């Protein structure tokens, strides 16, 4: 029922629904050997992870040429947004960065099986050449000051960052502003009344 409810809320095509379901099955299968998501969240995977990831696409002003997902891990949000873009904006490319080799192998398997326009970089974010991304996302990766430092070298001139955050987001913004100039829009989360999505623009070091 949770699956049907989330898919209805997302209002996606049959093909997209099938790919999202396929991806969830892959996560559940691999999670037994590789710690992709917390075991306590498996039963709520459709709301806690799929919907929480998919909502990021609702905050785009235009379809990105390149979407960079940092610390992709289990593929939330990277794989989910790539699945949704496959039919809505097939020209968009996705780059998923994950330094853990086992998780990177999972991500490559998912991209291959789902036939996504996505590539996986099994490397540390700090070692990458500038990616010039239109959108950068990161979920449960680091505090905002650190996310700004990781993202800034890879943003296109008019690029945005989409960072889901929890109850401590106000203090994280204050801490980040000590070192970074930015425009911040705080957007409500569909999955948690205490959570937000931080949309950052014009990110530059002080």
UniProtKB/Swiss-Prot annotation:
Protein's UniProt keywords contain rRNA processing: yes
Listed GO MF terms: rRNA (guanine-N7-)-methyltransferase activity
Cellular component GO terms held in the UniProt record: cytosol
Subcellular locations according to the entry: Cytoplasm
Location, primary (coarse class): cytoplasm
Gene3D superfamilies, alphabetized: Vaccinia Virus protein VP39
Protein keywords: Cytoplasm, Methyltransferase, rRNA processing, S-adenosyl-L-methionine, Transferase
Annotated positions binding S-adenosyl-L-methionine: 71, 76, 125-126, 139
Catalytic reaction equation(s): guanosine(527) in 16S rRNA + S-adenosyl-L-methionine = N(7)-methylguanosine(527) in 16S rRNA + S-adenosyl-L-homocysteine
InterPro entries, sorted: rRNA_ssu_MeTfrase_G, SAM-dependent_MTases_sf
Record's keyword annotation contains S-adenosyl-L-methionine: yes
Enzyme nomenclature, EC number: 2.1.1.170
Enzyme class: transferase
Lineage top rank: taxon: Bacteria
Function per UniProt: Specifically methylates the N7 position of guanine in position 527 of 16S rRNA.
NCBIfam families linked: rsmG_gidB
Family: Belongs to the methyltransferase superfamily. RNA methyltransferase RsmG family.
Protein name per UniProt: Ribosomal RNA small subunit methyltransferase G
Organism field: Cereibacter sphaeroides (strain ATCC 17023 / DSM 158 / JCM 6121 / CCUG 31486 / LMG 2827 / NBRC 12203 / NCIMB 8253 / ATH 2.4.1.) (Rhodobacter sphaeroides)
């Amino acid at each position: 029922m949770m699956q049907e409810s989330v898919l209805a809320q997302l209002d996606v095509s049959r093909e997209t629904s099938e790919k999202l379901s396929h991806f969830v099955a892959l996560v559940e299968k691999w999670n037994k050997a590789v710690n992709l998501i917390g075991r306590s969240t498996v039963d709520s995977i459709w709301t806690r992870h799929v919907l929480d990831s998919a909502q990021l696409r609702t905050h785009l002003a235009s379809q990105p040429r390149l979407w960079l997902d940092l610390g992709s891990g289990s593929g939330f949000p990277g794989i989910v947004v790539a699945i949704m873009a496959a039919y809505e904006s097939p020209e968009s490319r996705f780059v998923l960065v994950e330094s853990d080799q086992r998780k990177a192998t999972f991500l490559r398997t998912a991209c291959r099986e789902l036939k996504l326009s996505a590539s996986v970089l099994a490397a540390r974010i700090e070692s990458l050449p500038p990616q010039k991304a239109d959108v950068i996302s990161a979920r449960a990766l680091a505090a905002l000051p650190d996310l700004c430092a990781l993202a800034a070298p890879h943003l296109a001139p008019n690029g945005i960052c989409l960072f889901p955050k929890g109850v401590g987001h106000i203090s994280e913004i204050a801490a980040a502003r000590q070192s970074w100039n930015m425009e911040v829009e705080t957007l409500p989360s569909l999955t948690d009344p205490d959570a937000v999505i931080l949309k950052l623009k014009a990110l530059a070091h002080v």
